[in-house]
Amino acid sequence: MRIAITTPTGNIGRELTKRLLDQRGTQLILLARTPDKLKKEQARGAKVVKADLGDAASVKKATQGADALFFLCPPSFAVPNYRAYYVGLAKNGAEAVKANKVKHTVLLSSVGAHLSKGTGPILGLYDAEKIFSKATQGLTILRPTWFMENHLWHLDEIKNMNSIFMPLSGNLKAPMIATVDVADRAARVITGPAPSRPTIVPLHGPKDYSLDECAKIIGRAIGKEVRHVQVPPAKAKEAMIGMGATENVADTMLEMYAAFQAGTLKDEAKRSPETTTPTTFETFVKNVLLPALKG
């Protein structure tokens, strides 16, 4: 089975690649802007193809001969319009799927992608789901919730100020998931049979966590108190632009945060044993966040 993977150096793509390289009967095609970053994977038998998801011809050529495709729209703070950026990538991917008759596509989407307004960058994934659904019936849509890895954006704040600054209240609770668990489910799905029509797979992590609770867990792990601090949206926007975000990206992120705060950005599916995944926030902190703090 020949499986093409986009963004193979990202958190999810990297873990998915590891899992599939360990499985017999899979041949991987890794689409990468910088193939040199994948020498280890190439040495293990993966075919590494230089490709740019923003170039339709490049994606089409790279996915020739693929039986399945894992498609992830990589986030970018530098784009002038976040939604248009996602739509462009999705169109390129969908055209490649249709042209190359890829039997099974696994699209990484997001919680809230069923909503047509008010969700900021997730609106681009709402569009992406529609675009791929028109291109193929063999589509599995993964809708994970809030990534635990989002806390990695706050490493400097944790190190230097023992705080995490966000435009959200500390008592806000949300399901959170580790990207390793998303990769686990993606590996299971993409090596299974293709669906006969577009199918949605919600992923809710182990439980709901409040942001105050996350700060306390991090504090216990590093041996000092860490606080969650709610900041005004204007301060959050200033910080994002300082990190390189365009004004449009910052505004769409604030729209998403506002939807989380209001409780309108939530999954239409209820938690179940099938949507619950094993990695706890404590395990994420131990295995991922602590090494990142020390690194």
Regions found by a protein language model. Name each.
Residues Y85-A90:
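Aromatic "clamp/platform" in nucleotide-sugar-dependent glycosyltransferases that forms part
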Residues G45-A46:
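Glycine-enriched alpha-helix->loop->beta-strand junction motifs that scaffold or abut catalytic
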Residues A234-G295:
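A hydrophobic C-terminal alpha-helical subdomain
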Residues M1-E41, G54-A57, Q64, A68, ...:
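Oxidoreductase cofactor-interface core, primarily capturing Rossmann-like NAD(P)-dependent enzymes
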Residues A51:
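Cofactor-binding loops of NAD(P)H-dependent oxidoreductases
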Residues T179, L211, P233, T280-F281:
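Structural motif detector for alpha-helix initiation sites
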Residues V229-V231:
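A generic structural motif
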